[in-house]
Design a protein with these regions (language model features):
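Amphipathic alpha-helical assembly/interaction segments
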Residues: 1-158
Length: 158
């Protein structure tokens, strides 16, 4: 397969690794933090997926803009999933995920993304949406932290 020297090909890596960030606007809201980390990885994947697309192509700018808005929407969950603002944020996240899935599929139709990459990003978006849904159904998801010791059976008491 001949490569065009003007097209940058993303380096193949096992995972999308992002630098560790110590700033945590989520406090004790573990689920929102996990959702945000997922959204960060999706945004990074979108940037990699669109790296070789011309800057003048609206699909590139739209996909990247949507990933920024998704990050903003997930950041809105920091005050909680069940509060009135959390409900609005969840609705926005679901709408944004659906729009991003459509945009990623258009990238595939336009020949900018392989079927495999399109499928992976689509699944990651769907899983983010499902995670937000499941996290919104219980307060345990936001505030409860289990340690390894909490889950181990005390052998002395058995």
């Amino acid at each position: 397969m001949q490569k065009d020297s003007n097209i940058k090909d993303a380096e193949r890596t096992g995972t999308i690794s992002l630098p560790v960030v110590r700033a945590n606007p989520f406090g004790e809201n573990i689920s929102a933090e996990k959702a945000y980390r997922r959204a960060e990885r999706i945004a990074a994947a979108i940037y990699i997926l669109t790296r070789h697309v011309s800057d003048s192509d609206t699909l590139k700018s739209r996909a990247r803009e949507s990933s920024h808005i998704l990050l903003h929407d997930v950041l809105g969950l920091r005050s909680g999933f069940r509060m009135e603002s959390g409900s609005d944020a969840i609705s926005s996240i679901h709408a944004r995920v659906r729009e991003m899935i459509s945009t990623v599929q258009l990238l595939s139709v336009a020949g900018y993304s392989s079927k495999e990459n399109t499928g992976m990003v689509t699944r990651a978006l769907e899983e983010l949406s499902q995670f937000v849904d499941s996290a919104s159904t219980t307060t345990l998801s936001e505030r409860t932290v289990f340690t390894r010791e909490d889950l181990l059976i005390d052998q002395a008491s058995v």
